């Protein structure tokens, strides 16, 4: 099974100037733990629940922006990578979210739950 089959709707997207409060609201509203940070050139970062927690723990306030806390220039994967290879890479790197990009276009973000479900699901 390839990641393409796990990428559903597009990722939730915010701009680099989005406040961290609004980033948290997007995550809560859409029940996601990561959002893509995109500008006019495309994907420039990913902001996760861990990034928000790290920011709070190190003293950022509600005036901070997505660009202040995001992981800039995140590693990305293509949609045709095998789920098992993605799982191995996530284990090796500690990543819990993988932006899936094809021909420069963000298709979505696959998280560790998606990957684990695909590996253990009898329908996979």
What are these regions, as identified by a protein language model?
Residues 1-10, 48-78, 82-91, 106-107, ...:
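Tandem CBS (Bateman) regulatory domains
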Residues 27-30, 35-51, 90, 98-113:
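A glycine-centered beta-loop-beta connector
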Residues 22-25, 37-39, 57-60, 69:
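Short hydrophobic/aromatic-rich motifs at helix boundaries and adjacent loops
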Residues 13-31, 38, 77-94, 101, ...:
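The conserved cystathionine-beta-synthase
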């Amino acid at each position: 099974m390839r990641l393409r089959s796990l990428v559903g709707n597009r990722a939730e997207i915010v701009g680099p100037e989005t406040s961290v409060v609004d980033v948290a609201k997007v995550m809560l509203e859409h029940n996601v733990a990561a959002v893509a940070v995109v500008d006019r050139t495309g994907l420039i970062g990913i902001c996760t629940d861990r990034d928000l927690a790290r920011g709070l723990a190190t003293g950022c306030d509600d005036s901070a922006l997505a660009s202040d806390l995001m992981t800039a220039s995140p590693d990305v994967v293509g949609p045709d990578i095998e789920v098992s290879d993605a799982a191995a890479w996530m284990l090796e790197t500690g990543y819990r979210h993988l932006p899936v990009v094809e021909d420069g276009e963000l298709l979505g973000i696959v998280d560790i739950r998606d990957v684990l479900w695909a590996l253990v699901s009898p329908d996979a």
